[in-house]
Amino acid sequence: MEIHYEYAIKRGDHRIIVLPIYNMEALEALLTRRSCKSYRPEMPSEEVLNKILEAGTFAPSGRGAQAAIIVAVTNKEVRDQLSQMNAEILGTKADPFYGAPVVLVVLADRTKHTYLYDGSAVMENLQLAAHALGLGSCWIHRAKQEFDSEAGKALLKSWGIEGDYEGIG
């Protein structure tokens, strides 16, 4: 990693401290990531998927509460069930996941004051990591309605998730 230093500048009684500037690929990822609405049917490798999930777990959270959890849905039947639930909420028969072979569900604990922000930060980390690893992603909404439904609550229970969780994306 290449490091460039800038100098501290003093203006009047205020001293401005300028930290090192890093030539990082992260900035490029931030500027070039776009939502993808067409996917290849191949499942990403377990290694790639784990790197994306790990990046999601490093998202910031209010007071370190870690209110969000991520569920990687790689089972086609469950993925298709989620797709159907989401499509019904949207009022369409089309696949709202655009054929993506894996769906990452982010849920956040409603009892934490910053749960919506925490879950949203996880979503962004997941998307940036996917982009950095050459995969497309798209934040699909309606997860709140999905997991507030009886079918959604049954899925959470089958996954061993207990508590007051809201679907973020």
Task: Describe each PLM feature range.
Residues 4, 13-14, 22:
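Intrinsic-disorder-associated, low-complexity terminal segments enriched in Asp/Asn/His/Tyr and depleted
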Residues 6-8:
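Short hydrophobic alpha-helical segments enriched in small aliphatic residues
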Residues 56, 111-155:
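Small-aliphatic-rich amphipathic alpha-helix that forms the alpha element of a beta-alpha
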Residues 19-102:
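N-terminal amphipathic, basic helical "cap/leader" segment at the start of enzyme domains
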Residues 94-96, 154-169:
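A glycine-rich helix N-cap at a beta->alpha junction
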Residues 69, 101-104, 136-138, 169:
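Structural motif
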Residues 88-124, 128:
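Helix-adjacent hinge/juxtasegments
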